[in-house]
C-alpha cells in the first residue's frame, strides 16, 4: 500500500521484500479541465501544463546538475533545460503540455526515472518540484485542476506501476489551494544509503525561474 506523503515525513527506500529500492520512477499524473458550454450541451477542454523537474546538489549545497523541460528558454540567465542528468542516472520522459484529455488513464503524464546506482558520487541530494506553466489555456492554481498527484513507484513509464511507494495528492491538499508551485521532496545520502524526505511546500511562484532560485536557496542542504 502506498504511503500518503505528509510534510516532513521520511521514508526508507525499501521494497516489500526488504531489499533496497534503487530503480524507480517519480511521476506526475493530472487531468485537463473540462468546461461545459451552452447549458451543458457541449464541452471545452482546457489544456493544463504541469512541469516536473529536479535539481541535484553536492554536500555543500552547490548545484551539480538539473532536469527541466528543454522548452524553457531562459536567454542565458539559467542553464537550458534537458531531459537527462549528466551521469545518465535520471531521465525525464518529456514535456506533457495538455494533461489527460479523456479522464484518468492511470498513467503519469510526466516521469523522471531514477537509477541510484548510477548517480555521481558528488551528488548528495536530489530535489523534485512541480510547476504550473502559464499557457494560453490555463493560468490558475492547483485547486482548479480536476486531479493532480505525484508518486514514487517501481515500474516503467509506459505501464501501470508494479508498486507505489509514496503518493502526494496535489489538487486535494488545502495548502496547495492558490499555489502554483510545489517542492515535493528530497532524495539524500545518509551513512552510505539513500533516504527520502517529503517536503510538500507550496508557493505562488508565477514562473519556474522563481522556483529554481527558491530550491537552490532553501532546499540544497
Where are these regions (language model features)?
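Intrinsic-disorder/low-complexity signal
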Residues: 1-221
